[in-house]
Regions:
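A structural "domain/chain start" motif
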Residues: 1-62, 66, 169-185
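Surface-exposed short loop/turn segments
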Residues: 59, 63-68, 72-141, 149-185
């Protein structure tokens, strides 16, 4: 017997958001000398997929030459991070009649009608925005702020005459950048 699961988020959804997080932290630096010991305070970083994004922030700081510490008491500086967005946006354009749900009686039972289109496209975009500020671990004095780190990762798919499809339907594991779709409309 084969068991099929229906997770709350698809693998493509998770990959889009995680890749946006990776892009948001590219080139992250702090206004302190390299080699400084930094504690990443995640108290105000609340979002779905927060663990992945926080790991991406730590990896970017480590790559930039900072020593990441696990305890506040070991740090020269505290980097308090917060999430502005870490989610998925979707946009669908249809030339024709989009799929819809139509009530069929007073009980509000509905019937689903399929899309009847000449052309449609669908954009799915992972969006990540983080910011934070840095303060001295001993004195609490501010050392600087990190302006919003913004990352996006988008795939676009197209459909003509309800059957002919092209473009990227899924984000593939290990794939880094799909580039632009064959034709962008």
């Amino acid at each position: 017997m084969v068991t099929e699961t229906n997770p709350a988020r698809t693998a493509t959804d998770m990959l889009l958001v995680n890749r946006a997080a990776d892009r948001a932290v590219e080139g992250l630096t702090l206004p302190i000398p390299q080699g400084a010991r930094v504690f990443v305070d995640e108290t105000y970083f609340q979002a779905e997929n927060a663990r992945y994004a926080l790991s991406a922030i730590r990896a970017a700081l480590s790559e930039a030459g900072y020593a990441i510490v696990r305890e506040r008491g070991e740090a020269d500086a505290i980097f308090e991070v917060r999430a502005g967005a870490l989610s998925l946006d979707q946009l669908r354009r249809v030339v024709g009649i989009p799929d819809m749900r139509v009530p069929i009686n007073e009980s509000l039972n509905v019937v689903s009608l399929p899309e009847l289109s000449l052309y449609s496209n669908r954009d799915r975009m992972g969006v990540a925005e983080f910011s934070g500020f840095l303060y001295d671990a001993r004195t609490g004095m501010p050392l600087g702020a990190v302006t919003p780190m913004i990352g996006q990762y988008k795939i676009r798919s197209h459909k003509a005459f309800m059957m002919i499809t092209w473009g990227q339907q899924l984000a593939q594991p290990g794939e880094r950048d799909p580039g632009s779709s064959w034709k962008e409309f």
